Amino acid sequence: MTKYAEKKLLRSRLLEARRSLPFEEVFSLSKKAQRRLLGTRFFRDSGRLALYSSFANEVLTDEVFKHAVEAGKEVFYPRVSLEGIRFLRVKELDELTPGAYDLREPTEGFEAAGPESFDLIVIPGVAFDESGGRIGFGKGHYDMALKGATCPIVALAYEFQVLKTKIPIEPHDVYVSAIITEERTVVVTGALRGRKGEEHDA
């Protein structure tokens, strides 16, 4: 089986598992994962960060946004177009409106920033492994947008999305620096290089 076919199969299986979560569980597990993130040095040391607007039962990020704004941090959200992802600053969640793929996005005209200017980038995903490998929706938006990032890239996920076996990775795929779930924080040794992950308590 090709890597593409393996990724497609994994993506389908885990998307179905995530879609089957009742909202009460999404809310409860998201709260735990967000609180873990808020307690990390990744969040504490950041002054400018990028978040995502949750879609299709992804881990929620609203609590992270609230704490970031209260702490005086600058928060940016992705806006998706045919050209790829642009990050635009958001000061209130009601500034996000339905855009591409029905995602809540900032509108054009807001302050923009490139990934190289962030102290932290928080992203979603469909599947991960403990070496920092990630499978997304298959569009490649984050893989293209984050090539120039030098800051930690942290994924929020449910524990069932973190696989014990290595997921199939292709040359263009971006690794994450850490994966935070409702149960644990996995910090990847070697940052974005995909080396063996180490489990850390938050």
In which residue ranges do the predicted regions lie?
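Surface-exposed, charge/polar-rich loops and edge strands
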Residues: 2-5, 9, 16-20, 71, ...
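N-terminal active-site beta-alpha-beta segment that forms phosphate/nucleotide-binding
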Residues: 2-116
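Glycine-rich, N-terminal phosphate-binding loop of Rossmann-like dinucleotide-binding domains
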Residues: 53, 125, 183
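Short glycine-rich anion-binding loops that position phosphate/pyrophosphate groups of nucleotides
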Residues: 55-57, 126-130
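Charged helix-capping and loop-helix junction motifs
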Residues: 66, 136-141
